[in-house]
């Protein structure tokens, strides 16, 4: 196994930079640069020198010996001043030792996976934690990174192996009298795992929205204040506003943190009949995005109707509260009237929905768990038909077990790993 190194912090000028080295020669490299013996697991403060003895910097040097490290290999980390010149000099000194190469993106984490320090779901959790923009995303990623989904999958797998072993024993003694009917215990094990997995599958859709973000579309006729409201919600000028109808012709997106949840606000083209080809394209796009949005905020008069039908959770408000005698049920992006109340209502709706999220967060999780669900349903049906069909039930159970192994990355995930690790930085 080669020794690898990389800058683990962001490139550019900073107060502190961290360079990570992992592999069989990591300790050797640390001792060459410090001219000192490193502890098996500890930290020293030392000058760093190149091969000619020139002082490059003073640094905290952390050392971890295999297997008690992030990658499961020997690791040395140099915490030094974040000068671009200092980082470049230390990186060059490491390369000049001739026993290490620059890491590929995500290679440290790949080694942690290969060495059993993380499972695939934890790798995905780490990627999500790095990308987290809101508190809800951070909490969600931490749960996955802690191994919660992997632990669940291992528990399900253990129960299925137990059920399969009972079936296999019965098959092996098919010509003899088996003293105990294993059918009740097998059905109980299979039904329990099936119930748990189905519950997780039901929560994936909401969990995915937390990870990827919710969409809230502002919908209405032209010139009712949609863009002004978007700007008020965003706290900045994100959309052009004017007194002329049809100013907005494209969907304008603003990403924001709404009570800890990731939300993308959509300002859409005004809905109306038009002979303008470009405006017509914008209106069709507005309708498509509004149909897919999690919540639609309709700015409309009481007697107005649209081709887009309201759904549960959608909100309908009267526009331009500042121009009305009675502002009840109305909102104004220009004055801010009703904006705080709208934010609260959107937040409450989304929080109520996220109360039913699951641990699994990705389409991949849902797909592999659905494979297991299908196999388990078939296994239960076959078991109920009697011992003469146990060999078919055993194959269904093995299929369910393989699906769970795929979930945590034990089998057939090379292409997926390449995709995941390509999004990591060099030092991760």
Curated annotation (Swiss-Prot):
InterPro entries: G_TrmE, GTP-bd, GTP-bd_TrmE_N, GTPase_MnmE, MnmE_dom2, MnmE_helical, P-loop_NTPase, Small_GTP-bd
Chain positions recorded as GTP binding sites: 223-228, 242-248, 267-270
Any GO MF annotation of the entry: GTPase activity
Annotated cofactor note: Binds 1 potassium ion per subunit.
Cellular localisation: Cytoplasm
Reported cofactor(s): K(+)
Top-level taxon of the source organism: Bacteria
Residues reported to bind Mg(2+): 227, 248
Keywords: Cytoplasm, GTP-binding, Hydrolase, Magnesium, Metal-binding, Nucleotide-binding, Potassium, tRNA processing
GO terms classed as biological process: tRNA methylation; tRNA wobble uridine modification
EC number: 3.6.-.-
PROSITE patterns associated with the record: G_TRME
Major location (coarse): cytoplasm
Family from the record: Belongs to the TRAFAC class TrmE-Era-EngA-EngB-Septin-like GTPase superfamily. TrmE GTPase family.
Biological function: Exhibits a very high intrinsic GTPase hydrolysis rate. Involved in the addition of a carboxymethylaminomethyl (cmnm) group at the wobble position (U34) of certain tRNAs, forming tRNA-cmnm(5)s(2)U34.
Protein name (record): tRNA modification GTPase MnmE
Organism name: Ruegeria sp. (strain TM1040)
Source organism phylogeny: Bacteria, Pseudomonadati, Pseudomonadota, Alphaproteobacteria, Rhodobacterales
């Amino acid at each position: 196994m080669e020794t690898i190194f990389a800058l683990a912090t962001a490139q550019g000028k900073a107060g502190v930079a961290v360079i990570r080295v992992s592999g069989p020669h990591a300790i050797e490299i640390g001792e060459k640069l410090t001219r000192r013996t490193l502890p098996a697991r500890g930290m020293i403060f030392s000058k760093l020198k190149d091969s000619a003895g020139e002082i490059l910097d003073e640094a905290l040097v952390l050392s971890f010996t295999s297997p008690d490290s992030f990658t499961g290999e020997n690791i040395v980390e140099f915490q030094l001043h974040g000068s671009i010149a200092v980082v470049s000099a230390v990186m060059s000194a490491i390369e000049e030792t001739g026993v290490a190469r620059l890491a590929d993106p995500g290679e440290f984490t790949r080694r942690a996976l290969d060495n059993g320090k993380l499972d695939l779901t934890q790798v995905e959790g780490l990627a999500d934690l790095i990308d987290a923009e809101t508190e809800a995303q951070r909490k969600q990623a931490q749960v996955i990174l802690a191994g919660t989904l992997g632990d669940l999958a291992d528990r399900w797998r253990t129960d299925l192996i137990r059920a399969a072993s009972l079936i296999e024993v019965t098959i092996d003694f098919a010509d003899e009298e088996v003293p105990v009917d294993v059918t009740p215990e097998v059905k109980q094990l299979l039904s329990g795992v099936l119930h748990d997995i189905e519950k997780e599958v039901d929560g994936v859709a909401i969990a995915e929205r937390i990870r990827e973000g919710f969409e809230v579309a502002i919908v209405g006729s032209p010139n009712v204040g949609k863009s002004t409201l978007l700007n008020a919600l965003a706290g900045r000028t994100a959309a052009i506003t004017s007194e002329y109808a049809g100013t907005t012709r494209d969907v304008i997106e603003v990403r924001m943190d709404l009570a800890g949840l990731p939300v993308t606000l959509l300002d859409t083209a005004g809905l109306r009949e038009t002979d303008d080809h470009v405006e017509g394209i914008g209106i069709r796009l507005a309708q498509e995005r509004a149909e897919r949005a999690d919540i639609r905020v309709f700015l409309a008069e009481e007697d107005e109707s649209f081709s887009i039908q309201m759904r549960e959770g959608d909100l309908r408000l009267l526009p331009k509260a500042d121009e009305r005698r009675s502002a009840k049920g109305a909102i104004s992006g220009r004055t801010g009237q009703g904006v705080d109340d709208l934010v609260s209502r959107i937040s409450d709706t989304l929080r109520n929905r996220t109360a039913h999220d699951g641990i699994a967060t990705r389409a991949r999780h849902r797909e592999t768990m659905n494979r297991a669900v299908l196999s388990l349903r078939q296994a239960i049906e076959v078991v109920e038909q009697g011992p003469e069909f146990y060999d078919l039930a055993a194959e269904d159970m093995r299929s369910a077990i393989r699906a769970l192994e795929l979930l945590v990355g034990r089998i057939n995930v090379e292409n997926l790993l390449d995709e995941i690790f390509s999004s990591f930085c060099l030092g991760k």
